[in-house]
Amino acid sequence: MANIINLWNGIVPTVQDVNVASITAFKSMIDETWDKKIEANTCISRKHRNIIHEVIRDFMKAYPKMDENKKSPLGAPMQWLTQYYILKNEYHKTMLAYDNGSLNTKFKTLNIYMITNVGQYILYIVFCIISGKNHDGTPYIYDSEITSNDKNFINERIKYACKQILHGQLTIALRIRNKFMFIGSPMYLWFNVNGSQVYHDIYDRNAGFHNKEIGRLLYAFMYYLSISGRFLNDFALLKFTYLGESWTFSLSVPEYILYGLGYSVFDTIEKFSNDAILVYIRTNNRNGYDYVEFNKKGIAKVTEDKPDNDKRIHAIRLINDSTDVQHIHFGFRNMVIIDNECANIQSSAENATDTGHHQDSKINIEVEDDVIDDDDYNPKPTPIPEPHPRPPFPRHEYHKRPKLLPVEEPDPVKKDADRIRLDNHILNTLDHNLNFIGHYCCDTAAVDRLEHHIETLGQYAVILARKINMQTLLFPWPLPTVHPHAIDGSIPPHGRSTIL
């Protein structure tokens, strides 16, 4: 609402130049995937998801200045819903005209019942969204309705548009029997829209959609929004804001939620508690993910450079002992992030696993004590500090003893052959408990610092050996090489001239 109020008062944010780079990337993606058949396990790759994500956000960013006599008295975001404003949107105009209008020409040949390829799917859904039109060609909101005071009428029109974009994706999934194709419905289409109503309208009134194996990510997206309202008031733990469009969360926020709504971990995030959150931002070279950790309430801003499209991810895991156990799977590592391998995507509580944390890295930048070493020029010996007894496993303040999930007892009436089978649910419960105990008992940050210091000491031991050899042998001799730091790749100042 802050955005609409600012617009009403004439406070208009500076509209940035059209990001032609995202349009170019979108065109290349469509060309690359135009002939790629959609099969049962086909999904949209991480790189292509991020290109789609950028296109929708850049379209939103380029909305035109709103006329005083063309504003919604209800606060509805008409700049993204009506032809009056969309046709003035410079990004939209550039997209339609790009490459002699080739994308728009292809779009006009498509309809929802003939799409069979990935490129067709992406172009059709994205162009419906940025054109502000339903599948039948009608606009989300007619220009004559911009200033309407009929709250129920406007809310129903926006709700219909929101449902149509999701219903269309499910229709394609059902026809092709596909599990993982998914784009979502952007944040502004949820203006005064109840997620629970959308979920029940789509799944309860369409018998063909009852098979949740079809359109798994779409189902997971709508189910999550059905149990987590947009404005949670006293229950909110996080709030995302982009261009004045806000959304609050009380659960871990999987990547398919942020991606489907159009939010990014690089947006403004406000924390309402001191519970830790892990903000996943990119893949790393250990087949895992890099994350930033925030502990204090207030504004949490990721200051890292935005990664490339093939590496960037958007997901938040809440570390909160009071999280409802019924929904704790939303924070499981392999569900909170969409795997780049289609066959490994997890989207249901029954199959969610919480493994692989050892491959992830916390990347908050902290100043190390040994960045600048002045001790070489200090004639006084380094004082040995007095010992300070501490627990064998120092813990952060927020690491209270975790509440472990109960493990099912064996059923005494089962046959031996049945009892020795390992239930996947029990395995997931044990794995979850193990991860929580590990976080509780081990200060991973302290271990990381210790590893870093040990590696640095090893480098200085080599430097010292070189100096001794040079001063005692007094003639050239094969000297040991000072290799880059195994963790951060740095070379100590005293060893930079020794690299062979």
Swiss-Prot record:
Record keywords: Disulfide bond, Membrane, Phosphoprotein, Virion
Any one Gene Ontology cellular component term annotated for this protein: virion membrane
Effect caused by changing H53R: Loss of pH sensitivity in the fusion process
Biological process terms in GO annotation: adhesion of symbiont to host via host extracellular matrix; fusion of virus membrane with host plasma membrane
Disulfide-bond pairs as recorded: C43-C342
The keyword Phosphoprotein is assigned to this record: yes
Location relative to the cell: Virion membrane
Function per UniProt: Envelop protein that mediates acid-dependent endocytosis into host cells. Plays an important role in endocytic entry of the virus by acting as an acid-sensitive membrane fusion suppressor. Low pH in host endosomes triggers conformational changes to allow de-repression of viral fusion complex activity and membrane fusion within vesicles. Also plays a role in bridging the mature virion with structural protein OPG152.
Subunit structure: Interacts with proteins OPG094 and OPG143. Interacts with OPG154. Interacts with OPG152. Interacts with host laminin.
Entry similarity comment: Belongs to the orthopoxvirus OPG153 protein family.
Full protein name: Envelop protein OPG153
Organism this protein belongs to: Vaccinia virus (strain Western Reserve) (VACV)
Gene behind the chain: OPG153
